[in-house]
Regions:
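Active-site core of glycosidic bond-cleaving carbohydrate-active enzymes
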Residues: 2-232
């Protein structure tokens, strides 16, 4: 699963020598080289009998914690020219934004945000898409595609300007269609993406002390958010 690969590739820099980092690089090439003609990416690949797009896992893969983390920590950006056009097609042709510039939730082949219950898919989608744009912008700058970088930056500004007003209910981030308990995963992603203003951190800390829905996969981001918050409180 590429969601797991995203978490594992960052761990590899702490436990494996540089030869081990090549595993993630190979995975990146495989994922993008098997991109479907319409632009969708999916995993596991290659596969003869089961290959499905889990939209949020794919956003995680191409984004800040996935492809960008691999490039930054290995200091090897050699894969970027090979995957950039496919990444751009996925983020801007497969994915769509609404009139306010916010990403539209997609079902893909399997609409999956995490194990368990109380998954706020809309907030998670917005955060993962924002982080994917953040990575894409860095790659555009690396390739000196300044027009692309400026366009991506404008998209990020629009999302950042709308996020708090759309999802903050006075106590936590929730989408209007989410009927379950407040999703700790969504709060975590709001923090680590940078979309949650620092002024919300104290309230979010209360949410993290109450809500425990994340699986080990998403708990990584809950823990990271807690570290970021506790640097201030």
């Amino acid at each position: 699963w590429w969601g797991d690969e995203v978490n594992e590739l960052s761990e590899a820099f702490y436990v494996l020598d540089p030869r081990g980092w090549q595993l993630a690089a190979k995975g990146i090439y495989e994922l993008m080289n098997w991109q479907r003609p319409e632009g969708v990416i999916a995993s596991p690949v290659p596969s003869l009998n089961w290959c499905k797009e889990l939209p949020l896992q794919m956003l995680a893969s191409v984004g800040w914690y996935g492809f960008y983390t691999q490039a930054f920590y290995s200091d090897d950006y050699s894969f970027v020219p090979h995957i950039y056009d496919g990444l751009k097609k996925y983020l801007h042709e497969v994915w769509q934004v609404d009139g306010q510039g916010m990403p539209v939730v997609r079902q893909g082949d399997w609409s999956w945000g995490d194990w368990g219950t109380d998954v706020d898919m809309e907030v998670l989608t917005t955060c993962w898409y924002y982080l994917a744009l953040k990575a894409e912008k860095e790659f555009a700058l690396h390739l000196r595609k300044l027009y692309d970088a400026n366009q991506i930056g404008e998209m990020m500004k629009r999302i950042s300007a709308v996020f708090d007003a759309r999802y903050w209910n006075g106590k936590a981030y929730r989408s209007k269609l989410h009927n379950g308990e407040t999703d700790d995963r969504a709060q975590a992603m709001a923090v680590v993406s940078g979309l949650a203003p620092v002024g919300r951190y104290k309230a979010l800390l209360k949410v993290f002390k109450k809500e425990y829905h994340a699986s080990p996969y998403m708990e990584k981001y809950v823990m990271e958010a807690l570290f970021m918050i506790c640097l201030l409180y």
